[in-house]
Amino acid sequence: MYLPISKSETRGLVTTLIVILNIIIYVLTSFENYFLNISNYWLEKLAYSPLLLYSGEWYRVFTSMFTHADIFHIFFNMYFLYFFGREVEKKIGSLKYLILYISSGLLAIVFHTAFISITSSIGLVTPAIGASGAISGVLGAYLLLYHRRVLTFCIFIPLPICFPSRAGVFLIFWFALQVIYGYLRFVSSIAYFAHAGGFIAGISLLYLFSPRTHDYRRFTIYNGVLYIVKTVRKGFGKFSKAILSILVLSLLIGSVYSITNSSKLNAMYVFNIATTSDGADISSDTAVYINDNDVILPTRDDPRVVFNRFLWSGLLKNEAKARYVDSDFKINLMIKDPVYGTNLNLYVAGFIEYDEQGVLKNFKGTITTDVLVMTRQGFIEKISIKPGVKYYATIESRVHGENIGLTILQPFSVISTIVSLTAMYIVLVKDRDLVEPEYVYEPVEYYNGYFI
């Protein structure tokens, strides 16, 4: 963990108010969990999920920006916001800063949604919370304004090691990690493309808000010699500009790809599964299916076994069975567990119905199958097969977010493309106009009382 340290005494009213508001909301939403993490109730009410936009719950794009998962999440977010935000607010003014903050958060959500077609379709239903996207916009603005400023950073591994570094080095390195981890689909609960999108949104928005006039003033110092004080704006160095350009270009390419690929995300299927075996009580659970690679399995054992058998055997989706209905369906198969590579017997009998896309719509009947039983002895995991386990099962599916790719993901991809193009232009051409100036003193020659 990197923590920036500075002696700056800048005060930012809006930054402080945003921090206080986030803390108040966290206290209210984590109270029942002893302030350690957010309660499930508030997570379901306030978190952002792209699929819920389809049902009109647009308020979540705002509420998710002020909601945090746990105490560490809010602590580090608010620390970085307070440290970097006050400087940006001082430079561009409180109102413009507030607009930049909120807009960066919204555009971070746009990028997070647009890049779902690249990362994983499960992101359509995965709740997202946190102010990180908006704060990333503040970091992007800070990079343009103060990339030459020297700060002290500390790494805790576990003892703190502190070292000086230019703000630009740290922020470009952090930005690179977000882009790289995002494209590598780094296994994490972090929305990397939301961070990256918020960052370049801050770069783009700063151009609208930051003053770009050069400051010239005359005054006399030392021996009556007249000087001009001129502000000189030094933009990014060649190496920094090259790295930033490559990173922004990668987001631009991803955005364009998302425009063409998002239309393939047509819908999401939610399966309600009820099973019983050997006279046991009925076990009910839910599964989510988008495609064969993007599946959320049931958490309960029996529904998960039944769902996996339909998934592995190709009975869950088969375009050849579009609109197929059979009240006396029977099939005997040998299937392979994709995790352990074990062959399993499967016999399915009962009523079965498929929709027009060839996705299982209804099933009511029996499933007889071999079941893998895993036992652990110390650090050793043993797998055995329990043959011929019979389940009585009912499966029903519902379609959610039909044409969500065209109605939400594709428009968001267009917006992310525009923001990426704008950020690229600013990094390549306008960086000198935005950086906080350095002051140079130049003597002025004069003859006969006239300045020339």
Please report, for each region that a protein language model flagged, where it lies by residue:
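Short, aromatic- and cysteine-enriched interfacial helices/patches
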Residues: L3, F35-L36, W312, Y340, ...
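Extracytosolic and intramembrane catalytic regions of membrane-associated proteins
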Residues: N272-V429
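Juxtamembrane interface at the cytosolic side of transmembrane helices
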Residues: V419-F451
